[in-house]
């Protein structure tokens, strides 16, 4: 479980409203996401070990997509996936992991249906970039602050009354949680993308500093 260190009001902003202003130049670290293990459509294990040195973008995705999705799958595809798919030379370390659930948030073992759908609606769908996985979403969504737990929280305004199904996560190369953001609106997805870019700038700046010190 990740226990978030910011105050409850900010937690509610991040989880419930998903609003944020850029008042910092670096993304805060909220804690280690912990151990997790999923299985992708190729039968390969996706875990905290396989994702070392990668920026991992987590979502949940429903077998009812694209007709009924917790995240805006069309905007997620156009604003996020397509950009990173077309820029694998420089951004091949950014990976997508979508945990498949049914419309009620229960884990789904058979991935054939959703893989067929994504191949049909997502241009250039590539499982090596976008891992669609089976497993318990609680492994990464068990995020808590002041007795408010994202995985077990309920809200009448959320998909299936479960806010975590709408929530995107940024986990960095060291398995640290860096951002929690809803993914059901275009503006929030754009904001999420900006934070991924901000994290990448942090890595670029750190790498440049190391290179400078070695000269």
Predicted regions and their residues:
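N-terminal targeting signals for export/organelle localization
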Residues: 1-39, 215
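Short loop/turn microsegments at loop-to-beta-strand junctions
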Residues: 33-34, 56, 165-167
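Hydrophobic alpha-helical segments, especially N-terminal targeting/anchoring helices
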Residues: 39-40, 171
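Short active-site neighborhood of thiol/selenol oxidoreductases, capturing the structured segment around
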Residues: 48-76, 95-100
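Structural microenvironment flanking redox-active thiols in thiol-disulfide oxidoreductases
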Residues: 73-143
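Structural micro-motif
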Residues: 128-130, 141, 145-155, 161-169
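Thiol-/selenol-based redox modules, centered on thioredoxin-like
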Residues: 155-215
């Amino acid at each position: 479980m990740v226990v978030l260190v910011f105050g409850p009001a900010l937690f509610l902003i991040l989880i419930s409203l998903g609003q944020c202003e850029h008042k910092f130049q670096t993304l805060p670290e909220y804690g280690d996401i912990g151990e997790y293990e999923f299985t992708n459509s190729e039968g390969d294990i996706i875990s905290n070990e396989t994702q070392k040195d990668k920026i991992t973008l987590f979502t949940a995705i429903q077998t009812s997509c694209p007709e009924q999705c917790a995240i805006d799958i069309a905007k997620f595809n156009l604003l996020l996936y397509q950009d990173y798919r077309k820029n694998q030379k420089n951004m091949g370390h950014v990976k997508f992991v979508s945990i498949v659930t049914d419309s009620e948030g229960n884990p789904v073992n058979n991935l054939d249906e959703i893989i067929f759908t994504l191949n049909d609606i997502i241009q250039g769908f590539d499982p090596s970039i976008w891992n669609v996985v089976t497993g318990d979403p609680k492994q990464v969504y068990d995020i808590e602050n002041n007795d408010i737990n994202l995985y077990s929280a309920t809200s009448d305004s959320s998909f299936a009354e479960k806010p975590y199904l709408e929530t995107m996560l940024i986990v960095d190369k060291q398995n640290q949680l860096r951002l929690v953001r809803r993914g059901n609106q275009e503006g929030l997805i754009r904001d999420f993308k900006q934070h991924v870019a901000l994290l990448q700038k942090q890595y670029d700046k750190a790498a440049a500093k190391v290179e400078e010190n070695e000269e």
